[in-house]
Amino acid sequence: MTSYLLGSSSSAFPLAVPDAEHVLATRGVDGYRQYRIPALAVSARGTILAAYDGRPNLDDLPNPIDLLLRRSFDNGVTWEPQQLVRTGAGLQGFGDPSLLVDADTGRIFMFHAAGTHSGFFEAVAGLEPKDDVQHADVSYSDDDGGTWQHRRLTAQLKNPGITGLFAAAGQGIQIHTGPFAGRLVQQYVLLMEGSIMAASAFSDDHGETWQLGELIGPGTTGVGPNENKVVCLDDGQLLLHSRATPCRLSAVSEDGGQTWSPLQPVPDLPDPSDNGSLARFDGLPAVHAPGSAETSTWLLASNNHDPHLRRNTVLSLSPDNGATWPAKLLLCPGSSAYSTVTRLPDGNIGVLYERDGYREIVFASIPAGQLTGLLSARPPAAPEPSGLVFDMELRSVTPGRPAVWQNAGDFHVIPSTSDGQWDVQTWKEIGQGYAGDQVLGTREAQDLNYGPIVPGYKAGDILAFTGRVRNPGTEPATGVVLLGPHHNVGDFPPTTLLPGEHVLYFTPSYTITASDLERSTLQILFTAEADGGRVRMERTFSFDLRTGAVAAD
C-alpha cells in the first residue's frame, strides 16, 4: 500500500523508501544537549562528509558551539564516529557549517560563523571590537576531512555598512562549465544598514582569496532573501534559491555570482522560510553520477513543503533547469527542518536533515529511480479537504533554566528585544519557549546550571510547538480556538476563519514538571475546536521521558 502526503497544491507525494537511513546525531547523546544545522558533501575521493553543530543548548550563535563531522567511506552504509573540527571555548563558538569541495585540488572547505558576544542581529559594523563582530571563518582539509586548519575571512568579505555576516549553511559549489569554470562559490547572508541581504563569495584561485559579489535585496514581491543556495546550470549560469514564505525565491547570475537578477517566487516549492538546498542531479563536478545528455538540465531540491510550518521535508526534481518541479518524494511527513541534498557516488541521492523538533540529524540514501520515475508516472492528485485542517508539530526542546543562574567564567546577556524590527520567532532559534533573553554562559556554566547531558527530559525543560488551523471550505468557521496544556493560552485567542483563511500558533509551550517524571511517558494533547465545539480536531504527542523519543498521531 502506498502512502501519500496531501500537499498545499493538492498533489499526492509518494513516500521515499531509503536504501539506508542513519541517525547521525541525537539530542543528549555523545556529549551535546543539542545538534543542529546539517551540511553534506562528497569529497573528491568519494567520501561522504556530514557536518553539523554540537551545541550546549538550543541557542544559535553566540554560544560556545563546536563544529562536528562524521565521514562515510561506503556511500553512507557505515559511518565513522563523530569528530571535532573546531571547539568553542569561553563564550566563543563556531557554527552553521557549509561544505564546499574543490574537485581540482581535493581541498574541502567548511565555511562557518564565529562569534563571542554577538550573533547576526547584534553584530557591529567594521572589525572591532572583535568580540562584538560576527566573523566569517573557514576551516579546510587536504586529507579528505581527517584534519583541519582554520582561517578568518571577515576582512575580505565584510564591506562597509555590513553588520551581521554568515555563510548560508549546507553546501557551496564549484562551477563546472562555462567562462567561470573552476570558480568556488559560497553563499552568504548579511545585514546591511538594517536590511537582510544575500551575496555570493567567490574565489578564482582555489580558495586563497575571496571577494563578495553585489548584494541581493528584496525581489519582485517585496520579499527579501535569507539563507540561500546556488547551483551551476548546464550553460554555466548560476541559479539561486532562498528560503522565504510562502514559497522559495529564485534568481539567476550570468557572471559567476557577481550580480543577480531580481528575486522571483518559485510556486512549485512552498516554504516556511526554512533552510533548504539545491544541487545538480548529476553531481558535477565532485560526483560523476550515472546520467545522459538529457539529465544535464536536471536539478534536485530539498525543503519543507509547507508555507508556514517546519514539517514535511520533500525531495523535488526539476528536468528543466529549475523552471518547474514536477516530481516530488516525501522524505519526512512530520516535524523536520534544515536539509542538504547531494548525489552520491553510487548514484543514489543523499539527504541530511533535522527531524523531530531538532532532536535528530538523519542521513537518508534514496535510489534515484524513486524520484525520476515520477516524471513519467505521476501519482494522482489527492482531493483537498472540505472541512477545517489542523496541523501541530514539535518545534524544539529547551533545557530548563534555573531560577538563579550561576556564573562560571565569562557571562553575557542578549535581551529578547535586541533584534529590533526583526521577529525573534522567525529569524532566530533561542530557548525559553522563544520568549526570554538569551543568556550566554561558558560550557562550564551551562553544565553547572543545566546539569548532566542526557537523552531524556528533566523538570523545567520546555517543549515548544507550532501549529495551524486552515479553512479550505466554503463556509466561515467561528470560535476557532486551540486547547491544550500549554502555559501561554492567552497568546492564542479564539478567532473566525473565513474560507481560505488560516491561523498560526507560534509557539504554544509546555514545561515538564517533576511529577511528569514520575512516569515513563508524557502525553500532550492539543485540540482545535470551532463552531461552539461542533468541530473538534486532535493531535497527540508522546514523549519517552527516559530516551527522549517522540511520537505523534
Which residues does each predicted region cover?
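Exported/extracytosolic protein signature
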Residues: 383-553
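Asp-box/BNR beta-propeller blade signature and adjacent active/binding-site loops
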Residues: 4-383
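Enriched but not universal
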Residues: 1-6, 552
